[in-house]
């Protein structure tokens, strides 16, 4: 597993935990930073995970509005928390990280959904992110 793939999973953990516990993302990041500092092998993935989470916080309103706009028959509150977190990461990478090709952002998000969410989540995530990426072409 690449460092970036691990970082996406760590960012997912941060966004998911903050969402489920009703905590702020910066507070959850601070806890994760303490864990990462205690485990030097986590440092490589930690840097990008933090960039993703902080990037989402900076653009949360815009990203969440896109999710609401492009999800058919689903509101943010109604979709599984893990799907919300995955979509937030994927959209941030598509819109705000020029170093990540759209196809990679979509593929990585779909892989996370396939392994961590419902049977329908992978196709839902794929469709949403593909539509959003198409607006950026």
Curated annotation (Swiss-Prot):
Q: What GO cellular component entries does it have?
A: cytosol
Top-level taxon? Bacteria
Gene3D superfamilies under this entry?
NusB-like (1.10.940.10)
What Pfam families does this protein map onto? NusB
InterPro entries for this protein: NusB-like_sf (IPR035926), NusB_fam (IPR011605), NusB_RsmB_TIM44 (IPR006027)
Instruction: Show the GO MF annotations.
Output: RNA binding
Q: What's the stated role of this polypeptide?
A: Involved in transcription antitermination. Required for transcription of ribosomal RNA (rRNA) genes. Binds specifically to the boxA antiterminator sequence of the ribosomal RNA (rrn) operons.
Protein family membership: Belongs to the NusB family.
> What is the protein name given in its UniProt record?
Transcription antitermination protein NusB
Q: Which gene encodes it?
A: nusB
